[in-house]
């Protein structure tokens, strides 16, 4: 016993250290209330155990209770535990007796859980070799499947031959379906009821819902013979009643012939979608499917026109419950629909069926091998509200969190799964949960019991003397007072005490609503936010204002609802620093002389000033030039007139000081050119309040006034000199031009050569004119004389 307690002690110390304060703050007054706070909490049932005040101090972490003086054997802390009831070893190799095959371990266990805690257990699964197989062939016999029916006439023999390579114990059966034999799913004229294909013309069987034709058998020839004798039928709409048939094939276990220790394969063959759920309301069928077997003496579905089609959820429940693995063999056009169904149905697979079912054999073999290469767990039973999680550890040893399926397994490989179970709340009932591999009959049964009570609750002293002469019952180290009594030991009477002594004012709540009045005194409640204190529980250390989510800006202490700031901080929220280090600009001036330092930050007061230290100010000018008017007024004024400069200095934000005792290290040296061209120098400093002080104003290097006569004389002489120079230049230019013209004339004259002759310009003083008319008349006279 001592070793167990010592081990328990070290276990307590290591558990949940990060929540050690949560148990004591929960306000638990009984052991059971303490356990409900969390799995890390424990209760001290030791008599006369006190620490500080209040019954709630008995509830804490085991380590804290030990530190408070509670003896280890009085600490109530029930632990979650797993007890394995049945754990047969997994089967290895081929087994002669299929009933002795074990494919999951363990097989049964009990699990005791503390609310809020979790427990992890390991489940192992191994598929045994040469496991028996039952295959039920469920075929759509609507008119469009006529060629498929001819193709599978020898399927039984071929399938048995191929399956014999995989298992030595194989059986197969046959069933068919069309549609609910009711309008609007079929035509209801007498001729078409008798022969739905009369309009083709072709003979068809009357429309039927589901027919179970051949129970599971190992006689392949019998299967072939049954298939050869089948005839097609017909209906109106494209979706068929296949889900009705699946439901009956899954739940009619005895008539189908499903064995308990075999792999149940249901091959669904169709070229159309299937009705489900409330589709049958079109025919006026409103009674939900009950999930029961309704095969009559002829092995036909007798409730086809009475019950609705099953829903997907109902199919999942019955397929899982009866360990049936569904293989959808459908045409290419329907694959996308049935793939969606297969994602919801555990263990279901989908294969593409050729138009004439020519590949059905290969499809079945491939689906079987795929199913045998996968191990997937499913959880059944009372699982609502449980916290369940899985981690798969497949054949390569790699863990896959949040996964309960292993793929690409070989028959004989072992798949392990870590299953974590937790319950969030205390429950007065036990739960029964089943964990099983999909498609296998083996299962792990788990009985989950909540651990919500303490062992000390079994021992109760009614009207105990430990409770003030029998005024209460003593249990788990505390008194449960009888009516009319109160107090830790039931020492106070409710009738004899006034609650007024626990009120700060008559209109206030007792103990400010944050404590209990015991025997005229307030016992303040524990709070997860901090301490509640005061004679009336009126104070606390967590109700002060917050800055950026931090109590008192994390720079002060909360005392009775008000922030008391630490050194270096001020303000209602203690968020305002008194330091001015961040306000000093690079030149050492507080806020560059353009603002005030408030809460450690510069508030720029000069228009246009900005920046962390108001260093940017396009409209401000430099700090020296901004003081020009004040400085020039001070230098030009004498005596009483200097008082007139005070206003100008105020506008410039400065004060002139004659004191020489100041710190020159942080002073700014300024130089300005005055109106009289004198160089003005002065120093600028800043006092503790951020005000600008001007020191050491001096004026030097003033230029002498100009000599006006000398300037005028110089200007006159310069003008005269310029005139003389211009005249000389003009004279030189004229002389140069004349000389050039004379030289040109002399050159032309030297080139001239004169000859004697008549002057072409001379004319004589006389002129001779000849009368042309006179000569013509003389000629006429001569002619007349000759004629005569």
UniProtKB/Swiss-Prot annotation:
Ca(2+) 1 binds at residues 144, 147-148, 271, 355. The chain crosses the membrane at residues 710-730. GO terms for cellular component: cell surface; focal adhesion; integrin alphav-beta6 complex. Heterodimer of an alpha and a beta subunit. Interacts with FLNB. Interacts with HAX1. ITGAV:ITGB6 interacts with FBN1. ITGAV:ITGB6 interacts with TGFB1. Residues 456-491, 492-538, 539-575, 576-615 form the I-EGF domain. It comes from Sus scrofa. Ca(2+) 2 binds at residues 179, 235, 237, 239-240. Mg(2+) binds at residues 140, 142, 144, 240. Integrin alpha-V:beta-6 (ITGAV:ITGB6) is a receptor for fibronectin and cytotactin. It recognizes the sequence R-G-D in its ligands. ITGAV:ITGB6 acts as a receptor for fibrillin-1 (FBN1) and mediates R-G-D-dependent cell adhesion to FBN1. Integrin alpha-V:beta-6 (ITGAV:ITGB6) mediates R-G-D-dependent release of transforming growth factor beta-1 (TGF-beta-1) from regulatory Latency-associated peptide (LAP), thereby playing a key role in TGF-beta-1 activation. It is found in: Cell membrane; Cell junction, Focal adhesion. Its main location: membrane. Residues 731-758 are annotated as: Interaction with HAX1. This is Integrin beta-6.
């Amino acid at each position: 016993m001592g070793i167990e307690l010592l081990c328990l002690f070290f276990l307590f110390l290591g558990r949940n250290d990060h929540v050690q304060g949560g148990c004591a703050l929960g306000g638990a007054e009984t052991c059971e209330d303490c356990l409900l706070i969390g799995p890390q909490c424990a209760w001290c049932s030791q008599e006369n155990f006190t620490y500080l005040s209040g019954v709630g101090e008995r509830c804490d972490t085991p380590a804290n209770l030990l530190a408070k003086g509670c003896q280890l054997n009085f600490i109530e802390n029930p632990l979650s535990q797993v007890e394995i009831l049945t754990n047969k070893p997994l089967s290895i190799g081929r087994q002669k007796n299929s009933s002795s095959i074990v494919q999951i371990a363990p097989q049964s266990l009990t699990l005791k859980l503390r609310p809020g805690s979790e427990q992890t257990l390991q489940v192992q699964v191994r598929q045994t070799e040469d496991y028996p197989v039952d295959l039920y062939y469920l075929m759509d016999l609507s008119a469009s499947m006529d060629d498929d029916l001819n193709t599978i006439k020898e399927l039984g023999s071929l399938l048995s031959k191929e399956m014999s390579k995989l298992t030595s114990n194989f059986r197969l059966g046959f069933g068919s379906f069309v549609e609910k034999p009711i309008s609007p799913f079929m035509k209801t004229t007498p001729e078409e009821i008798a022969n739905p294909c009369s309009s083709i013309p072709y003979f068809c069987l009357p429309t039927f819902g589901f027919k179970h034709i051949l129970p599971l058998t190992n006689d392949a020839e019998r299967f072939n013979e049954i298939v050869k004798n089948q005839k097609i039928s017909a209906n109106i709409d494209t979706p068929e009643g296949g889900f009705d048939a699946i439901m009956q094939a899954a739940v009619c276990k005895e008539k189908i012939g499903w064995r308990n220790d075999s792999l149940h394969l249901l091959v669904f063959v169709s070229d159309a979608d299937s009705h489900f759920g409330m589709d049958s309301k079109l025919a006026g069928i409103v009674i939900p499917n009950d999930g029961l077997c309704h095969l009559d003496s002829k092995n036909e579905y007798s409730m086809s026109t009475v019950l609705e089609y099953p829903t997907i959820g109902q199919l999942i429940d019955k397929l899982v419950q009866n360990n049936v693995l569904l293989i959808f063999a459908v045409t290419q056009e329907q694959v996308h629909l049935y793939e969606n169904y297969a994602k919801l149905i555990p263990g279901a697979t989908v294969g593409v069926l050729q138009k004439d079912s020519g590949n059905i054999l290969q499809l079945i073999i491939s689906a079987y091998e795929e199913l045998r290469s996968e191990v997937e767990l499913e959880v059944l039973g009372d699982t609502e509200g449980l916290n369940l999680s899985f981690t798969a550890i497949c054949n390569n040893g790699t863990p896959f969190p949040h996964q309960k399926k292993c793929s690409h397994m070989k028959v004989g490989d072992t798949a392990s799964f870590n299953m974590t179970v937790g319950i969030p709340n205390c429950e007065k009932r036990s739960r029964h949960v089943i964990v099983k591999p999909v498609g296998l009959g083996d299962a792990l049964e788990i009985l989950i019991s909540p651990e919500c009570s303490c062992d000390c609750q079994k021992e109760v002293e009614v009207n105990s003397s430990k409770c003030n002469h029998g005024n209460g019952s003593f249990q788990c180290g505390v008194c449960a007072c009888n009516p009319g009594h109160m107090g830790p030991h039931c020492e106070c009477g409710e009738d004899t005490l006034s609650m007024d002594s626990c009120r700060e004012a008559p209109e206030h709540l007792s103990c400010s609503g944050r404590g209990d009045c015991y025997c005229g005194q307030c016992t303040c409640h524990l709070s997860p936010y901090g301490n509640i204190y005061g004679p009336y529980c009126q104070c606390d250390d967590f109700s002060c204002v917050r800055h950026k989510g931090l109590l008192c800006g994390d720079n002060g202490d909360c005392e009775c609802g008000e922030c008391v700031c630490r050194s270096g901080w001020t303000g209602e929220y203690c968020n305002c620093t008194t330091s001015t280090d961040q306000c000093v600009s690079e030149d050492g001036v507080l806020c560059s002389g353009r603002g005030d330092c408030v809460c450690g930050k510069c508030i720029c007061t000069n228009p246009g000033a900005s920046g962390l230290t108001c260093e940017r100010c396009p409209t401000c000018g430099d700090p020296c030039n901004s003081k020009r008017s004040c400085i020039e007024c001070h230098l030009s004024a004498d005596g009483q007139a200097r008082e007139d400069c005070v206003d100008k200095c105020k506008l410039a934000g400065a004060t002139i000081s004659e004191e020489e005792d100041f710190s020159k290290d942080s002073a700014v040296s300024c130089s300005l050119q005055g109106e009289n061209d004198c160089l003005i120098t002065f120093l600028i400093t800043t006092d503790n309040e951020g005000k600008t002080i001007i020191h050491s104003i001096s004026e030097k290097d003033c230029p002498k006034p100009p000599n006006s006569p000398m300037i005028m004389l110089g200007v006159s002489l310069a003008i005269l000199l310029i005139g003389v120079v211009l005249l000389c230049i003009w004279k030189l230019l004229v002389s140069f031009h004349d000389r050039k013209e004379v030289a040109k004339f002399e050159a032309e004259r030297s080139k001239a050569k004169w000859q004697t002759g008549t002057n072409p310009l001379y004319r004589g003083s006389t002129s001779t004119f000849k009368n042309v008319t006179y000569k013509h008349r003389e000629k006429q006279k001569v002619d007349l004389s000759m004629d005569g």
